[in-house]
């Protein structure tokens, strides 16, 4: 069945080279950049999956190279089973559910399915949806479904196995210069969801079919790094990894690599404005980064809501505040929101998608997108007479 969900109105709006290992005390924490609020602008919002009765959770998205076809996958209930998938052929304005076209076993894949496009060194494209475990939490690690025809058909693939025991599957992936792809994830002892957490990485050289044995790349005494998001510097020479800090006693964490992930610097604090959970972002045509996440910055007026940070790689690298933040969606369920998909369309529209309880009442979480352009946001900053940094 094809369901078309139109624009729907509803009411609701580092990396820092300080001294390595330097962290900030709570007393220092306060907003240090402008904050815009578009969370009440319902004409910007699209419902991908409505949570009238069912909790729709933890989406990720993928935009194909044609600039219009977008996929969204998510789980049922908080960290629950996979199964839902939707496709948009108009850049996220309307969506068609594909659940009944997927392998039967996909509904047995557990926790936060994540969709990626991996191109192997020979140029072969594959779409992948990885999840954390098969059958139940703690089951065989990282099962997946895969498509070799741009998402027209899918087949179930075997789990990657015990070396990949995880809390969540890959939080992010990035192509490397040699044509391989780096993937990053996190776990606790024995793969359990408990402290101390550590971040691991693995590399595929055949488009996702096989992966190297994972190695630990971030472990911080007294902190719990997790949910890594890796991005590349504008000159292409450096990787940066932003990480959630799960004790939530300070800022988020970041680290850098100048050799394609072979070695990483010691994790340090991000700028205040990048403090949050489950970072995911994109680079705009003018070179800036827009990174969305669940706001967990101390003393933030948008704490617990779905926000985006706007700034340059230099801001991240040198610990600067950035240009501004945007409150994208308001959560009516505390901090239970903010696992995002982020896509940039050819007309410069940014489509930021998350799970969120977007209204008061008995309704549960929905998968919702917020749409905006940086030019619009820049102009609003100018109107407040706050110069762009």
Please state what every model-predicted region is.
Residues 28-389:
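Asp-box/BNR beta-propeller blade signature and adjacent active/binding-site loops
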Residues 1-14:
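Bacterial N-terminal signal peptides that target proteins for export
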Residues 18-31:
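Bacterial Sec-dependent signal peptides at the C-terminal "C-region" and cleavage site
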Residues 4, 22-24, 35:
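Intrinsically disordered, low-complexity peptide-like regions
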Residues 12-13, 20, 132:
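N-terminal leader/targeting segments
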Residues 6-9, 20, 70, 205:
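N-terminal compositionally biased, intrinsically disordered segments and leader/signal-like regions
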């Amino acid at each position: 069945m094809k369901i078309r969900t139109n624009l729907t109105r509803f009411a609701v709006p580092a990396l820092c080279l300080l001294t390595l290992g330097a962290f900030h005390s709570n007393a220092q924490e306060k907003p240090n950049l402008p904050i815009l609020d578009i969370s009440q602008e319902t004409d910007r919002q699209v419902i991908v999956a409505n949570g009238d009765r069912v909790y729709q959770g933890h989406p990720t998205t993928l935009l194909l190279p044609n600039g219009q076809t977008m996929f969204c996958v998510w789980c049922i209930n908080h960290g629950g089973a996979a199964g839902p998938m939707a496709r948009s052929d108009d850049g996220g304005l309307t969506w068609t559910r594909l659940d009944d076209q997927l392998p039967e076993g996909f509904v047995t894949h557990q926790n936060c399915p994540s969709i990626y496009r991996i191109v192997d060194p020979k140029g072969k494209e594959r779409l992948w949806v990885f999840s954390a475990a098969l059958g139940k939490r703690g089951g065989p690690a990282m099962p997946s479904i895969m498509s070799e025809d741009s998402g027209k058909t899918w087949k179930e693939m075997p789990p990657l196995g015990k070396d990949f025991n995880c809390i969540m599957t890959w939080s992010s992936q990035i192509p490397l210069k040699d044509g391989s792809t780096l993937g990053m994830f996190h776990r606790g002892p024995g793969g359990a969801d408990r402290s101390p957490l550590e971040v691991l990485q693995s590399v595929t050289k055949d488009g996702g079919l096989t992966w190297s044995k994972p190695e630990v790349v971030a472990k911080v005494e007294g902190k719990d790094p997790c949910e890594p998001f890796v991005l590349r510097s504008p000159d292409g020479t450096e990787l940066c990894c932003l990480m959630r800090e799960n004790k939530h006693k300070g800022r988020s964490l970041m680290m850098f690599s100048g050799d394609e992930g072979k070695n990483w610097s010691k994790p340090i604090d991000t700028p205040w404005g990048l403090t949050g959970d489950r970072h995911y972002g994109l680079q705009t045509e003018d070179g800036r980064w827009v990174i969305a996440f669940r706001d967990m910055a101390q003393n933030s007026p948008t704490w617990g809501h779905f926000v985006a940070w706007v700034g340059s790689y230099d801001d991240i690298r040198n610990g600067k505040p950035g240009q501004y933040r945007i409150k994208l969606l308001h959560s009516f369920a505390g901090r239970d929101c903010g696992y995002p998909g982020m896509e940039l369309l050819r007309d410069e529209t940014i489509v930021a998608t998350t799970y969120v309880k977007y209204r008061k009442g008995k309704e549960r979480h929905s998968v919702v997108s917020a749409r905006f352009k940086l030019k619009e946001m820049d102009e609003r900053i100018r109107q407040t007479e706050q110069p762009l940094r």
